[in-house]
């Protein structure tokens, strides 16, 4: 399936996604985070992502920019569970992944700089089926990440980008992605309804 078809199929599955059953896993999240998760009109990516996982059935997921863990928690609520999720985020005064209070046998949180490859020891990044770039939302950082990680992109991997229209720098990188830089064969702008600040779904 194309990036657009995958995006729309996951949106269709969202119609039967039980958000109420997920809320207990988010019990440590603040009210703002909960409101974002519940908002499917401009911020639907949270409920959409577990449905995307159900559609593509990845074995390995890498998330760059896990923060306090809301996105990770939502991914881990997918009906499909036969995957490992590696999520990395910078140290945040002990707040990193602080919303993740339940135990998930397939969740591997990493605290560190995603530009330091020493954080990925014993992890074969080339086996990643689904990537999510959601770190500092700056042109400089995203370029560095793509230059570093694109060599690990395997054919047909799905790569998602948050906040692609949030500033001129992020827009510039997205424009280059659309032109095929870093090896992408397809792209789909899913800003509406996934995230008002921009959301891109690509395929290698």
What are these regions (language model features)?
Residues 1-40:
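Rossmann-like AdoMet
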Residues 35-204:
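S-adenosylmethionine/decaboxylated-SAM
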């Amino acid at each position: 399936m194309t990036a657009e078809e995958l995006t729309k199929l996951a949106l269709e599955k969202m119609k039967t996604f039980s958000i109420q059953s997920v809320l207990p896993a988010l019990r440590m999240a603040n009210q703002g985070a909960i409101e974002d998760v519940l908002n499917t009109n401009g911020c639907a990516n949270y409920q959409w992502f577990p449905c995307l996982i159900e559609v593509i059935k990845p074995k390995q997921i890498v998330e760059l920019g896990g923060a306090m863990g809301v996105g990770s928690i939502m991914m881990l609520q997918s009906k499909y569970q036969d995957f490992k999720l590696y999520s990395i985020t910078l140290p945040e005064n002990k707040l990193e992944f602080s919303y993740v209070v339940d135990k998930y046998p397939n969740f591997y949180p990493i605290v560190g700089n995603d530009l330091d490859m020493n954080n990925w020891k014993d992890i074969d990044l080339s086996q990643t089926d689904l990537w999510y770039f959601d770190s500092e939302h700056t042109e400089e950082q995203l370029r560095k990440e793509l230059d570093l990680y694109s060599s690990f992109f395997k054919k047909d991997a799905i790569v998602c980008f948050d906040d692609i229209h949030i500033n001129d720098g992020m827009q510039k990188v997205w424009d280059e992605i659309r032109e095929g830089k870093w090896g992408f064969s397809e792209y789909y702008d899913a800003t509406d309804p996934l995230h008002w600040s921009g959301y891109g779904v690509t395929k290698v």
